[in-house]
Amino acid sequence: MILNKFLSTLGIISIALFCAGQAHAQQEQQVKAEIQKKLGSNAKVKSVTPAPVSGLYEVLVGNDIFYTDGAAKYLIQGEIIELASGKNITEQRQADINRIKWSDLTPANAIKNVRGNGSRQLAVFSDPNCGYCKRLEKSLQQLDNVTIYTYLIPILSPDSAQKSKQIWCSSDPYKTYIDWMVNGITPSGKGECSTPLDKNMAFAKTYGITGTPTLFFTDGSRFPGAVQITDIEKKFSSLK
C-alpha cells in the first residue's frame, strides 16, 4: 500500500516536471520566433535559452550574445556580472561559444612552422593584408618550442586572395609569408597551384571567424586580435 502510494506520488511529480519542461521549451520557441520576426532575415537567431537572471533569455545571433525579456519586447546588449563572485557570466559564456575542437582543424591546409621541440601548438588565421596580423607575426618571432599553423583566409580585399595564392604556391610558403608580413618583401610568382583557401574560408564561416588575426590554442580557446606575447605565454603556461 505504502509502495503504491509512493509510486503514485512519483508519477504525479514526473508528469508535473514533464509538463513544466514542455512549457519552458514552448516559451523559448515563442520568444525565438518573435525575436527572429523583429530582427528580419539579415540576422539568424541560433537559439534562445533561459539566462541566469530570472525573466531574461539569452539570444544567440550568429556567435553574438544578446538578452531579451519573456515577451521579446526588448533586445539587451551587455554583460551579466555576478556581484557575489565578480564573475562575468556573459564573457565566460562567450568563451564557451567561441571554443572549437582542436581536432576540427586541418593542418594540411595551413603553413606549418616548427621551432625548437615544437611541443606547444598554436593556430593563427591570417590575411596577408591585415596590419594587426603583421604586428602579431613580429611578436610571434619571439616564441620558441612551438609549432605554429597559419591558415590563410583572404577576407580583406581581392588582393588578399592573390597574395595568399602567391604565398601558398611558392617553393617555401613560410619564408615567403614571413618575408612579406615581417620584412615587407612582396610575394612574387603567379600563384597558380591548388590551394586550401576555399576550405579555410569555409571553416572560418562555420566557426564565426570574421576578423584577423584569430588565434586558437589546443584547448579550443579563441583569442581575437594582435594578442600580446605575454598573454600568449601565459595561455601556454595554463595548458601545462
Feature locations, PLM:
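Extracytoplasmic thiol/disulfide redox context detector
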Residues: 2-9, 15-165, 179-182, 186-212, ...
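Short strand-coil-strand connectors
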Residues: 62, 218-219
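Short secondary-structure capping/turn micro-motifs that flank functional sites
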Residues: 157, 220-221
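Conserved NTP-binding/hydrolysis module of P-loop NTPases
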Residues: 167-169
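Conserved, helical-rich catalytic subdomain that frames metal- and/or nucleotide-binding sites
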Residues: 171-178
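Short, exposed beta-strand-loop hairpins at the edges of beta-sheets
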Residues: 224-225
